[in-house]
């Protein structure tokens, strides 16, 4: 038998030892062989994600606020407060020695309060986008403590985990925004001897994950069951931002300060001056939130507390036109894509903003008002190629008067 045929006879995988006859393919190299089965095995190993060492952005407070300014009009104090709080939070994570000289840095969770549509949720969303970290929103009113019908607090962590594509390390540095936090207040500031399923009990349930714990998260959500497998998530470095309207909080602050907040109009109705209200809310203390019905331990987990003021007419007009993704800019771009130039008069913008104020939902109402205003045009424009320009006037907003339309080779009339 020749040397060449002997070599072929004895050829086998250098990794598993299988002979050429036992495999489909045997790939040869200089004095080495690998079979198709080992190639597939190696490919599978390489395809597996290595443990995440997710690196997040860490921006200085001024840099964070500058980016928030691009999308959020007004709320200067809230933006500064949250910028400092977020910077300190992520600086704490980045620090290699969190307990230098025996000093332990606490979490900088943030509590935002203010009326509906004042920008609380938008601030949190924009922040997550700026920092490029996983983000999720939860509604506090759907949460119940363990053992009651409703949503477990661990499901909030699950949604963050899903936003991070189940990358645990990435989720552990994400942001969770819990809205309507004021709706889980105690009905009285005194400790109740009865069980408060959706109030104090939920605050107690949230305490651990907010301050930092190893949460056992059901991978498919729902209630926990014995013998169920869990994903362990450390919440120590998750930034929690909570928000709520905290209606009439200014009255609690005024009482503490010995001031009167209420006036009366000609019809003997209560009137609260917006400037006075804003000034009072800027003087909020943890004890005011406790008096409102939040438990002391929960309030104590939030080092940064900021007020989002009620938006006034000039604010709403600016929100329509100024931010990077302003609603008016979006509609102008949509019409431009159809070859139509869309314009609004200043009076029209003011009328839209005034309708939002009357709706009582702040900036949230702006998009709906615009959608209703522009719906018929958005329906007709794609089928009418003769239109070149559209001008929206105040009367179009307030009286449903048709807008001024210019067609190709025609003047606006």
Swiss-Prot record:
Binding site residues for Zn(2+): 13, 16, 35, 38
Annotated binding of ATP, by residue: 115-122
Name of the protein described by the UniProt record: ATP-dependent Clp protease ATP-binding subunit ClpX
Subunit-structure text: Component of the ClpX-ClpP complex. Forms a hexameric ring that, in the presence of ATP, binds to fourteen ClpP subunits assembled into a disk-like structure with a central cavity, resembling the structure of eukaryotic proteasomes.
Gene Ontology biological process: cell division; proteolysis involved in protein catabolic process
Family the entry assigns: Belongs to the ClpX chaperone family.
This protein's GO CC annotations: HslUV protease complex
Pfam families associated with the record: AAA_2 (PF07724), ClpB_D2-small (PF10431), zf-C4_ClpX (PF06689)
Originating gene: clpX
One GO molecular-function entry: protein dimerization activity
Keywords associated with the record: ATP-binding, Chaperone, Metal-binding, Nucleotide-binding, Zinc
Function: ATP-dependent specificity component of the Clp protease. It directs the protease to specific substrates. Can perform chaperone functions in the absence of ClpP.
InterPro entries: AAA+_ATPase (IPR003593), ATP-dep_Clp_protease_ClpX (IPR050052), ATPase_AAA_core (IPR003959), Clp_ATPase_C (IPR019489), Clp_protease_ATP-bd_su_ClpX (IPR004487), ClpX_bact (IPR046425), P-loop_NTPase (IPR027417), Znf_CppX_C4 (IPR010603)
CDD domains for the chain: RecA-like_ClpX
Domain ClpX-type ZB: 1-54
């Amino acid at each position: 038998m020749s040397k060449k045929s002997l070599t072929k006879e004895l050829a086998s995988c250098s990794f598993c030892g299988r002979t050429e006859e036992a495999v489909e393919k045997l790939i040869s190299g200089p004095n080495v062989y690998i079979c198709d089965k080992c190639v597939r095995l190696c490919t599978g190993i390489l395809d597996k994600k290595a443990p995440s060492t997710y690196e997040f952005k860490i921006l200085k407070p001024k840099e964070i606020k500058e980016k928030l300014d691009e999308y959020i009009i007004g709320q200067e104090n809230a933006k500064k407060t949250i910028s400092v709080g977020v910077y300190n939070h992520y600086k704490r994570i980045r620090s290699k020695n969190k307990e230098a000289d025996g000093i332990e840095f606490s979490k900088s969770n943030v509590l935002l309060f203010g009326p509906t549509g004042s920008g609380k949720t938008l601030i949190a969303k924009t922040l997550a986008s700026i920092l490029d970290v996983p983000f999720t929103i939860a509604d506090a009113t759907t949460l119940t403590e363990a053992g009651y019908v409703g949503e477990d607090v661990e499901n909030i962590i699950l949604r963050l985990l899903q936003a991070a594509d189940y990358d645990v390390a990435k989720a552990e540095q994400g942001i969770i925004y819990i809205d309507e936090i004021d709706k889980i207040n105690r009905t009285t500031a005194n400790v109740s001897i009865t069980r408060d399923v959706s109030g104090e009990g939920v605050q107690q349930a949230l305490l651990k994950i907010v301050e930092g714990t190893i949460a056992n998260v059901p991978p498919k959500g729902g209630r926990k069951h014995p013998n169920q497998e869990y994903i362990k998530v450390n919440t120590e470095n998750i930034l929690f931002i909570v928000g709520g309207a905290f209606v009439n909080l200014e009255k609690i602050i005024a009482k503490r300060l010995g001031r009167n907040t209420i006036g009366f109009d000609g019809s003997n109705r209560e009137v609260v001056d917006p400037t006075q209200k804003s000034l009072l809310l800027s003087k909020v203390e943890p004890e005011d939130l406790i008096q409102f019905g939040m438990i002391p331990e929960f309030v104590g987990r939030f080092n940064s507390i900021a007020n989002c003021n009620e938006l006034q007419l000039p604010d709403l007009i600016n929100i329509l036109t100024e931010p990077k993704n302003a609603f008016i800019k979006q509609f102008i771009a949509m019409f431009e894509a159809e070859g139509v130039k869309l314009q609004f008069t200043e009076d029209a913008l003011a009328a839209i903003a005034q309708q939002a104020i009357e709706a009582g939902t702040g900036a949230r109402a702006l998009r709906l008002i615009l959608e209703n205003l522009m719906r018929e045009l958005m329906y007709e424009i794609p089928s009418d190629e003769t239109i070149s320009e559209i001008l929206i006037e105040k009367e179009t907003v307030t009286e449903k008067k048709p807008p001024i339309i210019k067609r190709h080779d025609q003047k606006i009339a």
